């Protein structure tokens, strides 16, 4: 998810006192960035890794590009996203939206969840709740995050500050690391100077333990 992650209220990005309208991909809001439907160019490939590059597309008013490196290691997959401003400064955010088959067990323990308002947008109000039957943003994992799928334990880690958990589907669960909360591109954005980058990583590891 680049150059924003999660929902953007009403699809409007406000930057330097100007409003920019984004496509309403999750009406009445924009969501999940502009590059999930973009064509990517392979810039490097090996037996165990690939690096992809895409521009942020015409739907993003500030230009810029993103690279995604995916590397298979002995016991985990390492993903690294790097979004780079072009000729103009811009707000930026990155994240991933992996879908997993419904886990038979999950250990997703966080310090707190950020409440949503009546429009489904994250607020700064915190509460303590389990990450079960939710579509919400969480902060500060209190233990390694893990899910068990088809008897294999997966451990999820990232240098992202926020995690969105979507657990409402009967067949799947999403555990999504993001560099900020939904709509943070307006509320408290990271601003990139021309040519500057924001880079984050996400690991999906398997322990080798088969859990029945």
Specify the residue positions occupied by each region the protein language model found:
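Beta-strand-rich recognition/accessory modules
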Residues: 51, 57, 136-212
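Extended, loop-rich substrate-binding clefts of extracytoplasmic carbohydrate-active enzymes
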Residues: 24-74
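Acidic, contiguous internal or C-terminal segments within carbohydrate-active enzymes
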Residues: 54-100
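Acidic-aromatic substrate-binding/catalytic surfaces of carbohydrate-active enzymes
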Residues: 1-19, 24-25
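Structural motif
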Residues: 12, 19, 49, 76-78, ...
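Active-site/ligand-binding surface loops and adjacent short beta/alpha elements
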Residues: 87-93, 98-159
């Amino acid at each position: 998810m680049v150059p924003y992650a999660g929902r953007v209220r009403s699809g409007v990005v406000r930057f330097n006192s100007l409003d920019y309208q984004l496509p309403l991909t999750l009406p009445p809001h924009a969501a999940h960035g502009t590059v999930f439907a973009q064509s990517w160019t392979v810039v490097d490939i090996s037996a165990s890794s690939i690096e992809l590059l895409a521009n942020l597309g015409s739907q993003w008013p500030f230009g810029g590009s993103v690279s995604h490196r995916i590397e298979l290691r002995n016991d985990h997959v390492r993903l690294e996203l790097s979004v780079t401003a072009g000729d103009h400064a811009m707000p930026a955010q990155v994240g991933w939206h992996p879908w997993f088959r419904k886990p038979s067990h999950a250990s997703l323990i966080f310090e707190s969840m950020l409440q949503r308002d009546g429009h489904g947008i994250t607020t700064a109000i915190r509460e303590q709740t389990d990450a079960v039957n939710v579509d919400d943003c969480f902060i500060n994992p209190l233990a390694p995050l893990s899910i068990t799928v088809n008897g294999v334990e997966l451990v999820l880690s990232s240098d992202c500050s926020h995690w969105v958990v979507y657990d409402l589907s009967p067949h799947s669960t999403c555990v999504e690391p993001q560099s900020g909360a939904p709509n943070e591109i307006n509320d408290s954005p990271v601003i990139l100077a021309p040519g500057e980058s924001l880079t984050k990583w996400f690991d999906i590891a398997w322990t080798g333990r088969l859990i029945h």
